[in-house]
């Protein structure tokens, strides 16, 4: 046989399956000790996989074991042959499965009986193949494992008079053959929590791989900007530290790192300033509400998957870079970065380590003026220094079990003497935010994020695949001081707040094959987390602030703003994935979520002398999803889904605005439950990949934020269109782009009369486009553009927060890379034509001191090399 029968809905046959990294995570201790599982691995026969391959004969009686008396490995032009010597080869039955770059063939009703022991192993037997192992998997099964150097080997099966021949072809060798080779299947994990071909998922998904991340980092290492330029459905990017206003389909996304939640109960909107881009392997974005990972994904899920170990024995790579504003080559604008990546694999142990340090200079707009360090009153990273330490350690306990520990520490501090001049707020007309030197502030804005993540997987535990995870996260973010003298709800104070959060939790999931040779699988499990959160503030002397023109912040004391609260959350879920035929895939599931919140007695910033009674809150939600994919032909498929997402209302925000006489029990917040309906079409041809989707979602209770810190709980509805296309007209040219159009309304008075949602929720039209060319071998050039349209739904004279008119803008970047010496030189020109424009988030600000322009033309150069 040349090919393996598959349940893939867009192709009847598939000869190659490429397993990508990013395994789903597990809650280890909820099922007892990991060492118990290690010492008692499952011995049952594996369930057939969708890539199962059988020989000609029906299975013999289990007690009539076929004896294999010899093993030979013979190199071939395409790879190698593993020959199992037996006089009854025609009775042998073979099934295959994939694990990373290893292809595993199990031969049932057979026993290895060699003259010199019952284990055969050979390293580097052929080009592109690192190891061949043949062992007795259990009492009636022989297991043959062939590991490819860079990718999964291909497999063919033959009989001979003297034995069974298993022919393996290294993929990298096969690609040089004139024979036609299928493209590897792209696997994603975020949409279903299991490794699933992207064409089997009835959702809109964007995957940004390591190569794309590195290219976009040539102009900006800020994840907010990288995602905003590449993901349809996401709002146009801002150039600050906050993802406030960076909505996905008009609602907040849930941000995960390897499945570890990065959000906090008191939403700090810093979820994407928690890890450096250098530590990321790829980013998977599921667009649209989802409850599969629990609370927070009303807009979708952004799952950041960290660097994986390489297959080489040792990989070491260093990168150095510098950037500066090109307007006048201002000395203060120079930024530098350094990173080093190392990965090693020895036997069944591997590790990955990444170190990244960056020092940013000042940012300058297209007119040569310095941009305030806090451009939109939500945080910035100009004049900031950051360091990121990442480590991942893994051990393959056996062919079925793996234990992996991941650690990441991100620390960023904004050491600046630049503030935003408050005097521009008194000048008539719209004024650009103005930088003011001389800032005096002891505690600098910044972010600190530490997480530890333990993962365990067992691929054959009683015919099921178990995945478990334990995680711990410690987080602190400190904001720039805020002038709240005109807001009674803020105590008419000038203050600086910080959010402190400590969270731990775990996940356990089991994937069990049900019927039809594993074409139907049930994923079921449990998630648990506990978080302690608070938001204290430092209060400053108002007289000193006024006398200094808004530059001096002399601390007079500490107060509580959001009281300490504890959130405990438990989620139970089940998800069915059924490949009904080669054309039709069905998904459906349910999740039950229960959460408890405990709050002690507290005092607010507005009423520091009044004690408000604490208490306990409980809320729960049951969420459903159902979807299907139908392949019209091997290249084109349509999909539809209904999914619910939910979000616990920002309890901390409600508590900090609590009036006298209020009690926690009287708050009784209900989760926001979002119903989402989506249809779409996907095409995957040799030189063109395209998708188009339409969606509509609604919720009875919204979470619309209004200044100076309140939330409107009212019915909302949001709808839109998204499209993406990539094409390769030739081997040296690539072109593509995305389209995003979103609308949304809110019934503020709950009277059936809907009005437009504000601009922080609903972005204007967004278009992106790129053209890339390999001009010479090893030299690539790319032009990319982003267009943000206008939006004037509240009238041209509206100056309220989030309701100001938004003007359109166009920005173009240039990215180039060339092989130079022992490494690669990359050059990036952000805002190539030096356009003076204001990001959407800036245009929506009520105060001109937060109306900051975007960066002007900025040059970045970096050089990376292996050693």
Swiss-Prot record:
Q: Return the annotated region ranges for Disordered.
A: 40-62
Task: Show the ranges annotated as biased composition (Polar residues).
Answer: 46-62
Query: Membrane topology type, per the record?
Result: Multi-pass membrane protein
PANTHER family, alphabetically? Answer: FERRIC AEROBACTIN RECEPTOR, TONB-DEPENDENT OUTER MEMBRANE RECEPTOR
Q: Which UniProt keywords apply?
A: Cell outer membrane, Ion transport, Iron, Iron transport, Membrane, TonB box, Transmembrane, Transmembrane beta strand, Transport
The protein's name:
Schizokinen transporter SchT
Q: Which GO terms describe its cellular component?
A: cell outer membrane
As for subcellular location, the record says:
Cell outer membrane
**Practical application:** Useful as a bioreporter in an application to sense bioavailability of iron in natural freshwaters, especially in eutrophic lakes with high iron. The application includes the V.fischeri luxAB genes fused to the promoter of this gene, and determination of dose-response relationships between luciferase activity and free ferric ion (Fe3+) concentrations to assess iron availability in water quality samples.
Per the Swiss-Prot or TrEMBL record, what residue ranges does the short sequence motif TonB C-terminal box cover? 850-867
Organism encoding this protein: Nostoc sp. (strain PCC 7120 / SAG 25.82 / UTEX 2576)
Please state, per the UniProt record, what induces or represses the expression of this protein: Expression is transiently highly up-regulated by iron starvation.
Gene from which this protein is expressed: schT
What are this entry's molecular-function GO terms? siderophore uptake transmembrane transporter activity; siderophore-iron transmembrane transporter activity; signaling receptor activity
């Amino acid at each position: 046989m040349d090919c393996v029968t598959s349940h893939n809905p867009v192709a009847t046959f598939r000869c190659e399956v490429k397993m990508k990294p990013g395994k789903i995570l597990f809650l280890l201790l909820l099922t007892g000790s990991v060492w118990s599982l290690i010492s008692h691995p499952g011995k049952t026969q594996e369930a057939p996989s969708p890539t199962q391959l059988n020989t000609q004969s029906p299975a013999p009686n289990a007690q009539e074991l076929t004896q294999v008396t010899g093993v030979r490995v013979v190199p071939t032009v395409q790879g190698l042959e593993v020959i199992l010597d037996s006089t009854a080869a025609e009775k042998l039955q073979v099934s295959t499965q994939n694990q990373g770059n290893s292809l595993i063939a199990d031969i049932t009703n057979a026993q290895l009986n060699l003259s010199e022991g019952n284990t055969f192993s050979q390293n580097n037997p052929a080009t592109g193949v690192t190891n061949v192992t043949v062992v007795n998997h259990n009492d009636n099964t022989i297991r043959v494992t062939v590991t490819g150097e860079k990718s999964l080997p291909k497999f063919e099966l033959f009989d001979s008079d003297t034995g069974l021949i298993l022919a393996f072809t290294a993929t990298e060798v096969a690609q040089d053959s004139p024979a036609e080779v299928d493209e590897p299947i792209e696997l994603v994990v975020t949409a279903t929590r299991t490794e699933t071909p992207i064409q089997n998922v009835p959702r809109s998904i964007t995957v940004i791989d390591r190569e794309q991340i590195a290219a976009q980092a040539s102009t900006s290492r800020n994840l907010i900007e990288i995602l905003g330029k590449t993901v349809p459905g996401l709002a146009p990017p801002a150039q600050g530290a906050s993802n406030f206003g960076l909505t996905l389909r008009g609602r907040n996304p849930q941000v995960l790192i390897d499945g570890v939640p990065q959000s906090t109960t008191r939403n700090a909107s810093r979820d994407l300033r928690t890890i450096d881009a250098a530590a990321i392997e790829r980013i998977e974005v599921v667009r649209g509400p989802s409850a599969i990972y629990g609370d927070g994904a009303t807009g979708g899920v952004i799952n950041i998957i960290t660097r994986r170990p390489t297959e080489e024995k040792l990989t070491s790579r260093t990168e150095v870079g510098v950037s500066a504003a090109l307007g006048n080559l201002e000395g203060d604008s120079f930024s530098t970065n350094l990173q080093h990546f190392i990965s090693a694999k020895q036997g069944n142990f591997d590790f990955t380590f990444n170190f990244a340090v960056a020092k940013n200079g000042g940012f300058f707009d297209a007119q040569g003026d310095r941009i305030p360090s806090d451009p939109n009153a939500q945080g910035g990273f100009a004049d900031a220094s950051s360091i990121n330490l990442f480590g991942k350690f893994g051990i393959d306990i056996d062919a079925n079990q793996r234990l992996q520990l991941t650690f990441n520490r991100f620390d960023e501090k904004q050491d600046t003497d630049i503030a935003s001049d408050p005097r521009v707020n008194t000048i008539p007309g719209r004024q650009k935010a103005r930088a003011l030197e001389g800032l005096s502030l002891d505690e600098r804005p910044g972010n600190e994020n530490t997480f530890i993540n333990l993962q365990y997987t067992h691929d054959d535990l009683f015919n099921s695949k178990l995945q478990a995870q334990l995680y711990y996260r410690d987080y602190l973010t400190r904001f720039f001081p805020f002038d709240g003298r005109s807001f009674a709800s803020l105590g008419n104070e000038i203050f600086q707040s910080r959010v402190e959060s400590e969270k731990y939790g775990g996940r356990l999931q089991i994937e069990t094959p049900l019927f039809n040779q594993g074409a139907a699988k049930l994923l079921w499990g449990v998630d648990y987390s506990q978080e302690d959160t608070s938001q204290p503030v430092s209060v400053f002397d108002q007289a000193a602030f006024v006398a200094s023109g808004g530059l001096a912040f002399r601390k007079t004391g500490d107060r509580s703003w959001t009281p300490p609260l504890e959130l405990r959350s438990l989620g139970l879920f089940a998800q069915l994935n059924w490949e009904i035929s080669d054309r039709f895939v069905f998904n459906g599931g349910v999740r039950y979520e229960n959460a408890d919140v405990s709050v002690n007695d507290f005092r607010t910033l507005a009423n520091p002398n009044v004690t408000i009674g604490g208490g306990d809150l409980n809320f729960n939600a049951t969420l459903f999803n159902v979807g299907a994919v139908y392949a019209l032909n091997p290249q084109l498929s349509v999909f539809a889904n209904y999914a619910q997402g939910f979000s616990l209302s920002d309890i901390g925000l409600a508590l900090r605005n609590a009036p006298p006489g209020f009690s926690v029990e009287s708050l009784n917040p209900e989760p926001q439950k979002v119903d989402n309906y989506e249809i779409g079409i996907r095409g995957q041809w040799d030189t063109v990949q395209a998708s188009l989707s339409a969606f509509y979602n609604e919720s009875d209770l919204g979470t619309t934020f209004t200044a100076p810190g309140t939330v409107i709980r009212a019915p909302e509805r949001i709808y839109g269109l998204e499209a993406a296309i990539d094409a390769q007209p030739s081997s040296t040219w690539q072109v593509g782009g995305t389209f995003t159009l979103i609308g949304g309304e809110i019934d503020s008075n709950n009277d059936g009369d809907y009005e437009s949602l504000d601009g922080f929720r609903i972005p204007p039209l967004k278009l992106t486009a790129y053209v890339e060319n390999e001009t010479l071998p090893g030299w690539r050039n790319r032009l990319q553009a982003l267009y943000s349209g206008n939006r004037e739904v509240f009238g041209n004279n509206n100056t309220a927060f989030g309701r100001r008119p938004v003007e359109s803008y166009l920005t173009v970047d240039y990215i180039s890379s060339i092989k130079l010496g022992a490494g690669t030189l990359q050059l990036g020109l952000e805002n190539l034509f030096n356009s003076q424009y204001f990001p959407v988030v800036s245009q929506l600000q009520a105060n001109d001191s937060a109306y900051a322009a975007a960066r002007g033309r900025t040059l970045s150069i970096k050089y990376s090399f292996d050693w």
